[in-house]
Regions:
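Amphipathic alpha-helical coiled-coil segments
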Residues: 95-110, 178, 182-205, 212-214, ...
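Metallo-beta-lactamase
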Residues: 248, 304, 311, 462
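Periplasmic alpha-helical coiled-coil/stalk elements that build and connect Gram-negative outer-membrane
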Residues: 166, 173, 177-298, 403-406, ...
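"Short basic amphipathic alpha-helical interaction patches in structured regions
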Residues: 99, 134-139, 159-167, 342
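Transmembrane beta-barrel architecture of outer-membrane proteins
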Residues: 102, 140-142, 188, 233, ...
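Small/polar, glycine/serine/threonine/aspartate-rich low-complexity segments that form flexible
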Residues: 64-75, 121-149, 276-289, 321, ...
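Terminal intrinsically disordered/low-complexity segments used for targeting and assembly
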Residues: 1-85, 249-297, 475-491
Length: 491
């Protein structure tokens, strides 16, 4: 006979013999069919809405919802796209989602402790006996159902539920911190790759200008105006420019690979995806919105890593209450219904019906002092969580102060790097005009060109350092959102 058919007959027989259990049995057996996905069945409402609707980042008006088709290798990658990919593909972010699901499941278990539990069973007995007077055969089936419900436990379930609730909030805050860290990492890697590409382009311009200087030196030598040493110096400069360009190309490729790894894209393809970065518009910076004390005060109150550590401390304190309550009395109620006798006691008489209702009071008297040590361990865990909170606060505030110093330094260097580049460009133009008419030698021309190369690289580094530090400052303060990327990148 089909197992499902046997189960249905068993439950129907118990329900008919015990009418009060009918509603409970129907609710128990039909509940899993309410959701298409078993993991989404949440009758106790323990699952946070972020798991179904997505995450809302600071300053955003749209939820973060990841899609498997969001990455296309042929698409030009801007900063917002890079951040979105990091938020969806990075293993650390995916692990934070799993941690939320785990804590939600534990919260559901804690809430389930307030509900009764129902179990049912069946047994079949066959008795074949024979004697000098003949033989007999007897077959009887036994059905039973038991309902148990904890009525009183002196606060243990309440403390356990509060701890689970706080740990879920800690998991949500930890995920916020993981998202901010992922965005900060993506911003740094993106601007490293962007800076490497700009450096490669600067080396290409330097090589083109060096070749122009070489052509001019060759023509001057052919006309008898220049000398062979000048031509050789120009050739040396071209060879050096080619070497520096080759190194810049290698650094650019390395930065793109590091960006792909940091965004978690290597797991999406068999090879390293070919990334193409968008061009950044150079605009005048607007400066920092707040001073360092304001940033630090905001981080102390709202940084997700600090909020998560505080929640861990609160959960540890609730665990102390749980440990203490386990040594207190508990009161349970049980109700059982037996049809055709009790199980494991041989076959009863057909048609027998028995109902048993009872209260069970359990009073722990002596546990070998284990309860004392368990409470001491719970107190020690509170001290450990408090120390971890202080460590997280120091780490967050220290990183924020360092990033603020980097941002202010990069902001001050922007104007200097622009002036340096403008002066170096005018110097090259002036020396080149003089060199074309024979009023300057090759050494002066090459020195001016080398100074221009250095000025271009300094400008590239200054812009990259400012944009990266500005956004990392937002992330280290726990305030970065996708909507703020475009505006913040121009400051």
């Amino acid at each position: 006979m089909n197992v499902d058919a046997v189960s249905r007959k068993l439950l129907a027989a118990i329900a008919l013999s015990t009418p009060g259990l009918l509603a409970v049995l129907v609710a128990t057996t039909s509940a899993p069919a309410q959701g298409a996905e078993p993991q989404r069945f949440d009758p106790l409402l323990a699952r946070p809405p972020e798991l179904d609707k997505g995450k809302l980042l600071p300053g955003d008006d749209q939820m973060l919802v990841c899609q498997s088709t969001s990455f296309r290798p042929d698409k030009v990658l801007n900063l917002a796209d890079a951040v979105d990919l990091a938020l969806c593909y990075q293993p650390q972010v995916q692990a934070s989602w799993a941690a939320i699901k785990l804590q939600a499941a534990q919260l559901g278990e804690a809430r389930a402790a307030y509900l009764p539990s129902l179990s049912a069973g069946a047994s079949q007995y066959r008795d074949n006996s024979s004697s000098t007077q003949g033989s007999s055969k007897r077959s009887i089936g036994t059905l039973y159902a038991t309902l148990t419900w904890r009525l009183l436990d002196f606060g243990g379930r309440t403390a356990n539920q509060r701890a689970a609730d706080v740990l879920l909030q800690a998991a949500l805050a930890s995920q916020d911190a993981a998202l901010q860290k992922a965005m900060a990492n993506a911003v740094g890697l993106y601007y490293d790759a962007h800076s490497a590409r700009a450096a490669q382009q600067a080396r290409e311009r330097s090589l083109a200008l060096a070749r122009q200087v070489l052509e001019t030196a060759i023509k001057r030598e052919q006309r008898g105006v220049g000398a062979l040493p000048e031509t050789l110096q120009a050739r040396t400069f071209v060879a050096r420019a080619e070497l520096e360009l080759a190194r810049a190309i290698g650094q650019h490729k390395r930065a793109l690979v590091a960006l792909a790894v940091g965004l978690g894209l290597l797991g999406e393809s068999e090879d390293v995806p070919a990334l193409t970065l968008s061009s950044e518009v150079e605009e005048d910076p607007l400066g920092l919105e707040q001073n360092l004390p304001a940033w630090l005060q905001s981080a102390r109150q709202y940084h997700p890593a600090i909020l998560a550590a505080r929640a861990q401390v609160e959960a540890a304190r609730e665990k102390v209450k749980v440990a203490r309550s386990e040594g207190l009395p508990t009161l349970d109620m049980s109700a059982s219904r037996f049809v055709n006798g009790r199980p494991n006691q041989g076959g009863g008489n057909r048609g027998d019906r028995e109902t048993v209702v009872g209260l069970n009071l359990n009073i722990p008297v002596f546990e070998g002092f284990a309860r004392n040590y368990k409470v001491d361990g719970a107190h020690a865990q509170v001290e450990q969580r408090e120390a971890e909170l202080r460590d997280v606060q120091a780490q967050v505030l220290g990183d924020l102060a360092i990033t603020y110093a980097e941002a202010t330094t990069a902001l001050r260097s922007l104007a200097s790097s622009r002036s340096l580049l403008e002066v170096a460009q005018r110097a090259v133009d002036s020396v080149r005009r003089k060199y074309d008419v024979g009023a300057a030698d090759i050494v002066e021309m090459l020195n001016a060109q080398s100074a221009l190369n250095d000025a271009e690289l300094e400008r590239i580094r200054s812009l990259s350092d400012w944009r990266s530090a500005r956004l990392r400052l937002l992330a280290n303060a726990g305030e970065m959102g996708r909507a703020s990327l475009a505006a913040a990148a121009r400051r």
